[in-house]
């Protein structure tokens, strides 16, 4: 009766865990996985451990990607596309982990090869950023995405552009681990010009979730500024996915009654159709700049142009290549470890066994016949406290 030979390390399909988050982060991870058809994939919403997980369960983190609202959107996307889900990577046994953020690095992936993928634009580097960088005891998430890359708990960090590589190195990220690949969703902004969004030639406002994440945001002043820029043209607001949509609609209706408001939809396609883009702190500014729109932003536009993600149309493919490199290194290490284990377990020839045994016994014999070993043991006073000295 024939038996199937067990799969070797080279034949076994690698297992890859993809840690998602916001819809932008989730779609990025999906695109990367599609470029790794030789691997078995599993996805999970963003997660933490210890007190972070306790706070999440208590619904104290609803303003973050850990919250139930954004977690549900992530899971809805994964279910809609029929993607395998392993919540919190509980199944284990992964050969590689991709994550959209290193502000929290779960304990159960810290011994695995990790690839960190930049999501988009960073939060401004204010006082919390400088405190977190100086005081290592502070958690990175206190400063928001400004501290991205500073955990050091990854093997490779895939970033959007050479400008961002320089920025992350200046912030303190290890230069030797950073790879410029471009980032999915922002590597081909021209594709968004092919859309069926019904409006054209308007002023688009991409608002932020600043208030939901406990940052200052004078919304009344901001809407007044938008009206001034629009100067009578059609004004359309695209709300941030994490924003309190009901409150935002109420404010816009009171201050800009002629404006249209969208809580859902593709912001990038709306940007492609607009004449003017107004943003606060948002990655959508990259799309506006890449498409040559008139842009008004809280971000320094000269800095945005320096940091603009590479328009290489191949970010997911480039990141997949980085993953393959790490998987190959991991496979080689496992093969070397197996070879060493097999060599150490192999039986020695009989004549060599006898010689090695005789040599070991001859070397060990003096320890058992020395007079100091045969003399009675006297304990010092220190033995009263559990410590025994031989004299």
Locate predicted features.
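Nucleotide-activated donor-dependent transferases that construct or modify glycoconjugates
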Residues: 11-22, 205
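Conserved catalytic-core segment of nucleotide-activated headgroup transferases in glycan assembly
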Residues: 25-35, 42, 185-251
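Catalytic donor nucleotide-activated moiety binding site of glycosyltransferases and closely related
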Residues: 47, 57-65, 230-264
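A donor-sugar binding/catalytic signature common to diverse glycosyltransferases
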Residues: 112, 263-307
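Nucleotide-sugar donor-binding patch of glycosyltransferase catalytic domains
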Residues: 123, 129-138, 177, 244, ...
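C-terminal amphipathic helix plus adjacent low-complexity
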Residues: 306-391
């Amino acid at each position: 009766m024939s038996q199937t030979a067990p799969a070797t390390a080279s034949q076994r399909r690698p297992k890859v865990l993809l840690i998602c988050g916001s819809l932008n982060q989730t779609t990025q991870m999906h695109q990367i996985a599609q470029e790794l058809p030789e691997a078995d994939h599993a996805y999970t919403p963003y997660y933490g451990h210890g007190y972070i997980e306790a706070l999440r369960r208590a619904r104290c983190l609803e303003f973050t990607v850990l919250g139930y609202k954004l977690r549900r959107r992530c899971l809805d996307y994964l279910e809609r596309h029929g993607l395998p889900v392993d919540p919190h990577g509980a199944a284990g046994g992964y050969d590689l982990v991709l994550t959209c953020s290193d502000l929290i690095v779960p304990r159960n992936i810290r011994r695995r090869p990790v690839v960190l993928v930049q999501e988009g634009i960073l939060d401004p580097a204010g006082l919390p950023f400088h405190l977190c960088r100086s005081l290592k005891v502070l958690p990175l998430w206190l400063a928001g995405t400004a501290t991205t890359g500073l955990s050091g708990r990854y093997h490779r960090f895939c970033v959007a552009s050479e400008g961002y590589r320089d920025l992350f190195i200046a912030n303190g990220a290890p230069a030797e681990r950073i790879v410029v690949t471009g980032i999915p969703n922002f590597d081909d902004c021209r594709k968004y010009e092919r859309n069926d969004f019904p409006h054209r030639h308007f002023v688009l406002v991409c608002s932020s979730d600043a208030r939901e994440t406990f940052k200052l945001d004078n919304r009344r002043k901001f809407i007044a500024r938008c009206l001034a820029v629009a100067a009578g043209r059609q004004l359309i607001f695209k709300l941030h996915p994490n924003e309190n949509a009901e409150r935002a609609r109420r404010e816009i209706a009171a201050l800009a009654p002629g404006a249209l408001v969208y809580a859902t939809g593709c912001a990038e396609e709306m940007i492609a159709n607009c004449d003017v883009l107004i943003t606060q702190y948002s990655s959508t500014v990259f799309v506006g700049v890449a498409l040559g729109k008139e842009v008004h932003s809280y971000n320094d536009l000269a800095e945005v142009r320096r940091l603009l993600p590479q328009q290489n149309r191949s970010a997911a493919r480039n990141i997949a290549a980085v993953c393959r490199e790490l998987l190959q290194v991991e496979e080689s290490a496992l093969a070397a470890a197996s070879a060493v284990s097999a060599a150490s377990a192999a039986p020695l020839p009989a004549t060599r066994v006898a010689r090695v045994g005789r040599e070991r016994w001859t070397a060990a014999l003096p320890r058992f016949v020395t007079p100091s070993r045969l003399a009675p043991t006297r304990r010092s006073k220190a033995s009263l406290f559990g410590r025994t000295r031989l004299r």
